[in-house]
């Protein structure tokens, strides 16, 4: 009986610990998006880009095809959203977030950009990777 009780305690402790890790990581990932949203709404592409992994392996896929590398993704944003009017006001709706592994997560959501002349909206899929305790976007598919 004692063995069964100890076994049960070990299993439930491990499950609770795993849930806490998942919740903590989910909050960190959502914080990356919130930081990006605030940076965007302050018209700060440099700060917005901090949510992306600064690597040549970063990929952004949009309607014009993929763009590889942090610097090229940044240039794409600067060219596409070259003024405060074009950037507008950004908001997100998160549809789903789940951990694929301890260091990889997938987030599905919708973006809305309110501008004076026209609004934009679409969907995105982000792949996050945990590096040295921090979560970064390594792949962004936005349409």
PLM feature segments, named:
Residues 57-68, 81-85:
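A short gly/proline-enriched turn/hairpin at secondary-structure junctions
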Residues 1-8:
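Sec-dependent signal peptide recognition
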């Amino acid at each position: 009986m004692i063995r069964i009780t100890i076994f049960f305690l070990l299993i439930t402790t491990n499950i609770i610990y795993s849930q806490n890790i998942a919740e903590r990581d989910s909050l960190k990932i959502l914080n990356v998006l919130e930081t990006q949203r605030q940076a965007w709404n302050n018209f700060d592409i440099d700060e917005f880009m901090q949510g992306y992994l600064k690597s040549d392996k970063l990929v952004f896929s949009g309607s014009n095809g993929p763009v590889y590398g942090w610097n090229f993704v940044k240039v794409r944003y600067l060219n596409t959203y070259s003024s405060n009017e074009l950037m507008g006001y950004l908001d997100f709706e998160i549809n789903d977030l789940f951990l694929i592994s301890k260091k990889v997560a997938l987030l599905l959501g919708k973006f809305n950009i309110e501008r004076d002349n026209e609004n934009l909206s679409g969907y995105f899929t982000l792949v996050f990777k945990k590096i040295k305790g921090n979560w970064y976007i390594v792949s962004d598919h936005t349409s």
